[in-house]
Structures are given as C-alpha cells and as structure tokens.
C-alpha cells in the first residue's frame, strides 16, 4: 500500500517530474517482510532493523518499511521492544522513530534531524538546529533545522512542525520552507512530490541538477556543458539547417528511424557515465595530404619523420601552426598554413633523408557535426570526428610522452599504469580508451579503462625460459628443443621485433621469422670470405664466444636471403602487443586483472582524465578544445522485472525476480521434458564410476523435483579415454544404445575434467554428438560431480536439459504487459551474430548463426541455422534462405503464420549500419515475400556489447541506488544525454552484476515498421532477458542474440579441413568444411 507521500509522487510522475522533497513517506509495517516500494513510500515490512524502519515488533525485530533513501517514503526505525522503536541512525522519536527518542511520537521522519519536531513529523533535516527536536512538533518553535546544512529562515521545518520553526534548504538549499509540508526548499526535483529520505511531503524547489549528493566530489557550477548550452541556440540551428543536406562527399542523409520520444517507465535515479563533455571554440580547420619519399618501411617511422619536421619548421614554414597527424597521409591544422603546396626535407639519425610533400586538400566542414548535434538528419560527421580523435590522440602521445604510452587504435597502454604477468612471459599492461562521440549534450569524450597482453621485453633467452617453464642448460639438444618447444614458441615469437646487443649503440632491429633447424655451433651460411658457422662468424668478427651455441638461431631474414642471429645476442623490443590467442590460464588471469569494482573503475577513469591534463596542452589551445574534468551525471530509469510463471503443481507458482536473480526452490518448470533413456560417459581418468553414479542419482532426483519426467538410471556408467575421444565416444554411444529398450537414447551425459585447457576436448564431444552421432549431450564438470548433494548445480543442469529436450522452464505471468506490441499479433523474433577467427588469422572462415522463436506469444523456444562464410565478412551471406527456413519452422511449430518480425542483430559496428540496411534487410524482405503476401513489418535492432560506455551509481553510500556488487541495478535504462541526438537508441543494463563493472548493452534501431514507443521496445528488450533458459538470472542481451552467439561459437568446433584433389603434384590443398548438424539435434535447442 502506498503511503500518503507516495500518492504525491504518483501525481508528479504523471507529469514526468521527480518527487519533491524528502517527502513524508509511509511508516513501517508491523511484521516482517520487505522494504516499501521506492518513490512511493509504501508500508513495507522490514526485517531486523533494515534501512527504513518498521513500526513495532520485538527488540531488534520489525525493521524496514517505507521507501528507500532518495525519493522513497520514510518510515520509522526498526522494531523495538513494544512501542519503543530502535532505528537505523540516531535521535529518532520514541515509538516509531529511529533510535530511542526523547519525547513525543517521533516516527516517520527525516535524516537525523533535530529541529522543531525532530525525526518525527517535526523539523530537522540533516544536522538541523531548531529548538525543540525529536517530538512531534508543535509549540512556538524556533529556528527550524536546515536541509543538508541549510540555514535560511522560513516558516516550517523539515518535518511536520506545527509551530513557527525556521525553514531549511534542501541540499545546501535555502528555500522558504523545508522538507516538511512547507512550500519552499530546494529538494530533489522540486514540486510537492512524495517522500524522500523519510521526511514529510516536501515543498517545491529546484531540480536535482543543482543539488548533487554531498558525499561525492562535484563539478563547480556551472558545468562546462551548461556553459556551452547557453551559448548554442538549438532552435536557431535547426532553422538554419532546415532543408540542407549532408556535406560529406558520398554520404547519404541518415535513413534510420527518428526517436519516437523518450521513455518514462520505471523508477528514476541518477547515474554517472564515463562521458566527458567536450567544448569546441574553434571552427577553422584544414585538411592537408602528406606523401613521404622514400616510403618508410617501419610504421612508426611516419610519425618520427613528421614530428621532427614540425619541431624544425613550426615557426618558419608552418607559420607557427601546430598540426596534428594521423600517422599516414593526413595532416590537420587550426587555420591555414602559409602555403598551398610545398615539399620539405627531413634528415633522421644515420643520415637518412626523406622528402615530405604537403598539399592543401580542403577546409574541414563542421556542418554535418552541427546538424547532428542539432538533431537534424545528416550523415555521420566522420571527418570532423576523425580530426577531433587525432587531436586528442596527439594530446596524449605527444604531450604526455613521459608515460611512454603505446597506442593501438583508440587505446593507450603503459606499464607505468600497471603491469602484471599473465603466464609464460606474457604481461597485461593497463591503459585507457578514448573516443569522441556526438551525443544529445553535444560532443562527448568517452574514456574507459582497458588492458591488453604484451610480450615481456628483455633478453630472448629469459623469455624462452619463462615460456617453456624450465632453465636452459647444455643438456638440451637442438632436436629436443625444436621437437618439444619449437612450435609453441614460434606461435608466440613469429613477427616479434628484436634488437641485437653485440653492436654497441647501434641497436638494429629485426623481425623473427623462425628457428634454424641446426644449432649456432653447426649452422652454416655463405659470407664474403667463404662458408662459416654462425659460431665462427661471431667469434671472428665480434670476438664473441657463444655460451648457448647448442641452441638454434633466430631466422630474421627471408628464404632467399636468410639471416641468423644467436638468441643470446637478441633482446625483445619493448611495447609489443601479444597478437596470438591467449591460453585459458592467461585468459583467466586477464579477467581477474580487469574485473575492477565499479567504484574503482570510476576512480581510475577520473584519475586518467586528471593526469592527461587535456586542457593544459598546447594542442588544446591550438585547436580550441576543452574537456570537462567531471563525468556526465544524468537521469536514468530502472525498469521493473517481469513476473514469471511456473507450474501450478509447485509450492511457488509465481516469482518476481529481485536484483535480476531468483532460484528454483519450491518451483517446477512450466513444461517438463521427458527423458526416457539416457547414459553417462566418464571421461575423467581419476574419477571413480561410483562417484559418478551417485551424482547421476542426485541429478535424477533433482530433475524430477524440478518437473522433468526423467527416467531412473538404468544403464551402467561408461568409461571412455579422453585422449581418444574421437573413437571411444561413438563406441560408448553404440554400447549404450544396444542396452536401451528402444535401441536409442535421448541424452548423453558426459563428465569431463576441470582442466582449463580442455576446450578442445569439449569441442570434440560437441562435434561428435551433434554432427556425427545425432544425440543431445550435457557436459558436467568433475569438481561438481565430486560434491555431495550438489542440489543447486543439479537444478541448473536440469534447466539446461529441459530446454534442450523441448521443455519450457518459465513464462511471463502477464504476457500482454511483459511483451507489448509482440503479444498483440503473431510475432517471430530473430537473433543473429557473426563470429570471426583470431585477429591475425586470415584464412579460417567466419561463422554466421541465426536463431528465431518457434512459439507465440510465450517466445521461449527457438530454432536455429548456422552457416560458414568468407573470413571476416560481417554481412550475413545467403540470409534470404536462412530466414525462409526459420519462417517455415515457426509456422510448423506454432501452427500459425507470423504477422510481424523483430530482428536483433549482434556484432555490427556503427560504420556498418548502412551496409546492413542495404544488404541484410532486403534479404529478410525477399524471404518473407517468397512465403507470404504483402510487405513485412520489420523492426531491426542492432545490439552492441563491444563499446566503452559504463554506468556508475551516483552515490556508493546509498545501497538503494545499486545492486550488491556496487553496479547499477538491473533494468537501468538510459535514452537521454549520451544517446544519439536524433535516432532511436538506448543503453540498457538488464543484468545484475556478478564480478567487476557491468557493461550495458547498446541498442540502435535501424528500421521500425511496427512503430514501437521507447517504453515498449525498452520493456520488451528488458523482459526478454529474463527468459534465458540456462540460469535463473537476467542476462545482458535478449536470449535470441545470446543463443546466436553461443551457436556461432559452438559451430567453430565443427569446422574441419579436408584435402582437395588436383593442383600441383606434391602440393597439399585443403578446404574448410562445416558439417551438417544431425536432424535429431537441429530441431532442438541443443545450443543452450
């Protein structure tokens, strides 16, 4: 039940305003239970003196009640003995107050107030100082308590004081009346709204922007964004650009849907975002083309040449201008150079001379940038954003060279920011990412912390010893070295730059191409004075006696012109990123390093902005750029979790997730699958079959309790060799089938080791079961099998098995409310993803996977299609036939034809949006029209996880503004300030935090024939995240996207190379093949 303060809030929410004041809020409940609803006060029933208080109960009992701090209704202290409440803070009133008060009725009051009326319905905000505290008010009063140290005089104190009482401001406010029923007071968003921190109804006042929480370092007023906002007339800009088209050559105006409005559903809250406003005071920019001859061989030489040129010629040829350079062919200046075209000469050390030709191309137009910022249709202002990114890059690299930053794309790393070994000579360097973006508030600099793997610099032999895990001695022969370590070492070292140490200051650099097949003692080559061994050459020419001549040399030349260097004379050049796939151990260590708590990550980001000193650099002055030193603070909303329905035979039939999580206790799945016959294969060499059998019995019991029709164990546990799984597993399967009554089994349970490096074994098991045998499989980890009565793990396994076998775990209690628009008309929901091989693998194919819902209106079951396509091609090939297959499957399974289509597309960058619209959406339309009459109603949404926007709670001291991990609460959505000025996009953090800082997903609508409102699409997207079958938690992206990603990852295990006949004699040719998934498996959700 809402409190009286809550009623006030509801009226203001309809006006899209935040509740006013601290508000009066409801009192606590009488028994046990939970806190009241946020914002609306509510008569919640706390337990054991939780944050808001309860009304009674025994000593230490009753607690809770009221809403949370900020906006929620108040509530007295926790239950005390009888009527004397024992509360959370101190000095509350007697009875319902916080701690045992002094006199009067106390109760539902403010935040440690002691003004007229005290905690109770009287005055006193935070450290108020009115005369007559604690009681119920009344009397002549005196000076009322201030708000957060507010001290102006007014008519009514913070509480409900009926006497005179001085007024108090809100957060440092100074309005006429306080947070009580008085009128003034600068409160959280003004108005007479509902309760805040357990005060009265609250008077009006200014918005929250003017009263940031007092416990955080705040930006000085006015903020940089506010300064620029006052100087920019958006209406005038729109009028100016009306009818204009984009000025970017070859770019079309944005064809993506405009935002249909802003969302309003959910509880409002404040969040901080790692976006820093960028002010631009200059608009006279010019683009120059750069050509260097002879062409520098090394990539880093380009910047060295231009840097020296600028240093030498800035105040002569460049007329005092300080240009910025992209590292290849583009130079930008703030103002024109004194020439249109000129050729200049640069000489580097070693008498290396280069000619640099500079030619004026054109002024850099900012019109597209201004049009987008004004919310007008325009192309992506790519050139303007590129210019700003280059300026900001040079601010870091050129003016903070004391940090020794190494740049990769938009990320900058330095061991000075932190370095930790991952394993085997591979280190993680900490760094940061920065990128300039166009948002609703204007230009924004997105800064985030980042880490990546580097090869440890120093002696090659030291690295080799770490990599192989042993000391190098003369007991190691060249044959032993190459046979046992050669391939693994060369995967790591190939392409790595080394410098020689035997030539004094001349540290010439080379790239490793391979190892020699012979040791330095015997490896020969032809020199100017005949054939020599490497050992002889270095001994004679450099008077060096090799200590490790028994090891192979590094080959740093080509096949035509080999060049051999002893490993002991080479050092690995610092600052080289490790380019190969990390081992499972290295991945695990990297994850642990990067899993910073939200408060720590935010602190690191702010420290990065401070130490980079953007506004103090020469280039900031030159180009007229200002960067705010404080992160953006904005209003977000927390969407409610949907109510989930379970089977009526369970003790708990309806579940409301809390903080994005719930459990299966006393619940049964909505539709339990039937497992008639199954077998278990033990792939662990040291695991006794009796232990496995005990686990299987527990799994059967738990599955039955969960609602599955699961046959008892009837087959013996089968043992198989993990080193020969390709042969053993099919044999064990046939053996199990021969014992089964129907000569087939429905499920193969496979127990595997916990070795972090068993990914290949897992992949082999899935490939064999799904593309060769044709049986559903469920892998279980040995460490979980060892545990006795591991009910929770068995329950999770049962949920996966149920979904794979055709069951349904849960559904929405109210489908119409949970899936607006979708529930009105038969709808098919797609998820699609394309995964690519490793960064430096150019031959392995990419995998495209598409899943689509098979039921309506529940939307819990999915069909799937997976295809192989050309390496690194992001656009899905042959999407027409894929969609057609899934449309037919929907009709087969649901017995109805779809009327509308929602397509969630993962893995697409902003630069590929137009390509997707032009290539993939027409394929979807083509598939639809081949089956149904009329044009399809398509809503196409790109889902992005690989971005660097992070949301942080505004106040880490307020547990109501975050989940248990310190992250924003699940359901937090943002569609203002940092989002696109015109187009339909939003950030949604649908998942609860587990470890580290949660990453919100970014959704960008590229087409919307179904005319979703912002609230409808955000609600559908958030609610779908509660229907992921493999766990009882909300996930970070909608299930169809999640399944598509898992399926694409799974299919990579299927890929095989087969020889191709023909071609040159003796030349082995291979082609990649993606085996077909067996039909018995394909018709299920085997990818769960």
UniProtKB/Swiss-Prot annotation:
GO terms for molecular function: RNA binding; RNA endonuclease activity. GO terms for cellular component: cytoplasm; nucleus. It holds the Pfam family ArgoL2. Gene3D superfamilies: 3.40.50.2300, paz domain, Ribonuclease H-like superfamily/Ribonuclease H. Keywords: RNA-mediated gene silencing. One of its GO terms (biological process) is regulatory ncRNA-mediated gene silencing. InterPro entries: ArgoL1 (IPR014811), ArgoL2 (IPR032472), Argonaute_Mid_dom (IPR032473), Argonaute_N (IPR032474), PAZ_dom (IPR003100), PAZ_dom_sf (IPR036085), Piwi (IPR003165), Piwi_ago-like (IPR045246). It comes from the Eukaryota. Residues 477-574 form the PAZ domain. Residues 211-220 have a biased composition (Pro residues). Belongs to the argonaute family. Ago subfamily. This is Protein argonaute 18. It comes from Oryza sativa subsp. japonica.
């Amino acid at each position: 039940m809402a409190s009286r303060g809550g009623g006030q809030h509801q009226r203001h929410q309809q006006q899209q305003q935040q509740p006013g004041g601290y508000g009066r809020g409801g009192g606590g409940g009488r028994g046990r239970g939970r806190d009241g609803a946020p914002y609306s006060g509510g008569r919640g029933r706390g337990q054991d003196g939780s944050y808001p208080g309860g009304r009674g109960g025994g000593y230490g009992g009753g607690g809770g009640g009221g809403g949370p701090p900020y906006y929620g209704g108040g509530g007295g202290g926790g239950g005390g003995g009888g009527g004397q409440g024992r509360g959370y803070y101190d000095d509350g009133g007697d009875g319902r107050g916080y701690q045992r008060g002094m006199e009067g009725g106390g109760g539902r009051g403010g935040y440690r107030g002691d003004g007229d009326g005290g905690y109770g319905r009287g005055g006193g905000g935070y450290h108020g100082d009115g005369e007559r505290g604690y009681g119920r008010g009344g009397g002549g009063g005196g000076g009322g308590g201030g708000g957060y140290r507010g001290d102006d005089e007014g008519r009514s104190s913070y509480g409900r004081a009926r006497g005179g009482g001085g007024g108090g401001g809100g957060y440092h406010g100074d309005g006429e009346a306080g947070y009580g029923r008085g009128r003034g007071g600068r409160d959280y968003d003004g108005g007479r709204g509902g309760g805040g921190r357990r005060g009265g109804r609250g008077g009006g006042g200014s918005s929250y922007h003017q009263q940031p929480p007092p416990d955080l370092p705040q930006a000085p007023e006015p903020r940089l964004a506010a300064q620029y906002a006052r100087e920019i007339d958006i209406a005038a800009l729109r009028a100016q650009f009306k009818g204009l088209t984009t000025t970017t050559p070859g770019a079309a105006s944005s064809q993506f849907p405009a935002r249909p409005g802003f969302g309003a559903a959910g509880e409002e809250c404040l969040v901080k975002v790692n976006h820093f406003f960028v002010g631009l005071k200059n608009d006279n920019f010019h683009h120059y083309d750069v050509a260097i001859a002879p062409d520098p061989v090394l990539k880093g030489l380009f910047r060295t040449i231009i840097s020296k040129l600028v240093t030498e010629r800035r105040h002569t040829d460049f007329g005092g201008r300080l240009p910025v350079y992209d590292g290849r062919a583009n130079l930008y200046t703030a103002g024109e150079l004194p020439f249109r075209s000129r050729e200049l000469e640069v000489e580097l050390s070693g008498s290396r001379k280069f000619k640099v030709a500079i030619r004026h191309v054109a002024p850099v137009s900012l019109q597209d940038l201004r049009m987008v910022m004004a919310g007008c249709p325009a192309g992506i202002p790519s050139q303007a954003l590129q210019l700003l990114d280059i300026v900001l890059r040079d601010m870091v690299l050129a003016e903070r060279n004391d940090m020794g930053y190494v740049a990769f794309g938009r990320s900058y790393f330095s061991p000075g920011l932190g370095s930790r070994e991952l394993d085997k000579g591979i280190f993680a360097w900490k760094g940061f990412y920065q990128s300039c973006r166009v948002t609703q508030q204007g230009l924004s600099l997105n800064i985030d912390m980042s880490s990546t793997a580097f090869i440890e610099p120093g002696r090659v032999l030291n690295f080799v010893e770490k990599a192989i895990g042993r000391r190098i001695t003369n007991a190691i022969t060249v044959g032993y070295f190459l046979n046992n370590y050669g391939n693994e070492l060369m995967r790591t070292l190939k392409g790595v730059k080394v410098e020689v140490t035997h030539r004094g200051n001349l540290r010439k650099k080379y790239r490793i191409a391979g190892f020699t097949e012979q040791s330095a003692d015997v490896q020969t080559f032809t020199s100017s004075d005949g054939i020599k061994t490497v050992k002889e050459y270095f001994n004679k020419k450099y008077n060096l006696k090799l200590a490790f001549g028994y090891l192979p040399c590094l080959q740093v030349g080509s096949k035509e012109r080999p060049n051999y260097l002893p490993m002991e004379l080479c050092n690995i050049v610092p600052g080289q990123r490790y380019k190969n796939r990390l081992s499972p151990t290295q991945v695990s260590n990297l994850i642990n390093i990067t899993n910073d708590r939200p408060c720590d990550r935010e602190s690191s980001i702010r420290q990065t902005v401070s130490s980079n000193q953007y506004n103090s650099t020469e280039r900031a002055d030159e180009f007229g750029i200002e960067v705010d030193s404080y992160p953006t603070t904005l209003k977000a909303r927390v969407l409610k979790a949907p109510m989930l329905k379970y089977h009526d035979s369970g003790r708990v039939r309806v579940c409301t997730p809390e903080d994005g999580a719930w459990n299966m206790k006393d619940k049964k799945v909505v539709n339990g699958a039937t497992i008639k016959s199954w077998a278990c294969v033990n792939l662990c060499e040291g695991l006794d079959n009796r232990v496995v059998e005990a686990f299987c019995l527990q799994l059967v019991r738990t599955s039955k309790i969960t609602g599955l029709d699961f046959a008892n164990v009837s087959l013996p546990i089968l043992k198989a060799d993990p080193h020969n799984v390709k042969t053993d597993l099919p044999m064990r399967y046939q053996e199990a089938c021969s014992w089964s009554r129907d000569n087939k089994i429905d499920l193969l349970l496979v127990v595997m080791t916990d070795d972090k490096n068993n990914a290949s074994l897992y992949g082999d098991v899935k490939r064999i079961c799904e593309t060769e045998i044709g049986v559903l499989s469920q892998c279980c980890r040995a460490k979980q099998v060892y545990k006795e009565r591991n009910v929770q793990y068995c329950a999770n396994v049962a949920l996966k098995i149920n979904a794979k076998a055709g069951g349904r775990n849960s559904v929405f209690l109210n489908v119409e409310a949970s899936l607006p628009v979708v529930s009105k008309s038969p709808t098919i929901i797609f998820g699609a993803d394309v995964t690519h091989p490793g960064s430096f693998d150019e031959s392995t194919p990419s995998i495209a996977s598409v899943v689509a819902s098979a039921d309506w209106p529940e939307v819990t079951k999915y069909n799937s299609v997976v295809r192989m396509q050309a390496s690194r091609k992001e656009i899905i090939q042959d999407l027409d036939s894929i969609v057609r297959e899934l449309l037919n499957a929907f009709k087969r399974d649901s017995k109805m034809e779809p009327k509308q289509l929602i397509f969630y597309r993962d893995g697409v960058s902003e630069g590929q949006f137009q390509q997707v619209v032009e290539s993939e959406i027409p394929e979807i339309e083509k598939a639809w029209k081949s089956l149904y009459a009329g044009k399809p109603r398509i809503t196409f949404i790109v889902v992005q996880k690989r971005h660097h926007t992070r949301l942080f709670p505004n106040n880490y001291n307020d547990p109501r503004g975050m989940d248990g991990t310190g992250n924003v609460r699940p359901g937090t959505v943002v569609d203002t300030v940092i989002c696109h000025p015109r187009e339909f996009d939003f950030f949604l953090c649908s998942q609860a935090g587990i470890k580290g800082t949660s990453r919100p997903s970014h959704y960008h609508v590229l087409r919307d024939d179904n005319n979703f409102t912002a609230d409808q699409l955000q609600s559908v997207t958030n609610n779908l995240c509660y229907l992921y079958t493999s766990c009882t938690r909300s996930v970070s992206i909608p299930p169809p996207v999640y399944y598509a990603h898992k399926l694409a990852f799974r299919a990579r295990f299927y890929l095989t190379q087969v020889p191709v006949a023909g071609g040159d004699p003796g030349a082995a040719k291979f082609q990649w093949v993606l085996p077909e998934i067996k039909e018995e498996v394909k018709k299920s959700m085997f990818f769960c």
